[in-house]
């Protein structure tokens, strides 16, 4: 695992180093949803997200991270961290190449971790103030560890993704993000569907539905997990 982390760190630094003379500042948003319930039953949940990006001439660098933890009556039921880095190089207003790194640690999925590095091509179908729609596909390498058997495996994967945003009103935006990694040992599918409602230039409320599916989870683990969230969003 140490070598994998070193590889990912080296790739991230190499991708970030590709720069030009004129760079826009980092822009993005942070989200937080925290619930503490006490009474006949005790439950706690924490849902944190960070998404930020920066454009440097033809380059765009993006960082995404999320953390989810939930417990009921002192018994933990969810504990997941997902982090990703992507660098895009624009060939034109619509086409781009990408290099991406992704790391996921989900305590209750049956996999101790799933880590991948990939590259490929993308296309922007819409890129307006109202609608944004882009897709991408490519190949990569993924390493995962079964937390039931303790075995680690790695193989080539096909990766695909879609990002969609639609400003249906001046204050309301619909978001859909899809990600897929398919290899011989497992196919990971994730989809986030959300609605954001602006309260001010910086603050918004976001309601989301997150679906995750592993087609070949370890024995005794379910294939599909879903999470419904309500977060406060701060844009910067």
Predicted regions located by residue number:
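Short glycine/proline- and aromatic-enriched beta-strand/turn motifs that initiate or cap beta-hairpins
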Residues: 23-62
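Outer-membrane beta-barrel "beta-signal"
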Residues: 118, 195-198, 204, 224-236
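Residues that define the transmembrane beta-barrel architecture of outer-membrane proteins
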Residues: 26, 42-46, 77-81, 113-117, ...
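Residue-level signature of outer-membrane beta-barrel architecture
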Residues: 34-36, 52-54, 89, 123-125, ...
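Solvent-exposed loop/turn segments connecting transmembrane beta-strands
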Residues: 36-44, 72-78, 105-112, 147-149, ...
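Repeated loop/turn-to-beta-strand initiation elements of outer-membrane beta-barrel proteins
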Residues: 26, 58-63, 94-97, 129-133, ...
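Transmembrane beta-strands of outer-membrane beta-barrel pores
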Residues: 34-38, 56, 67-71, 103-107, ...
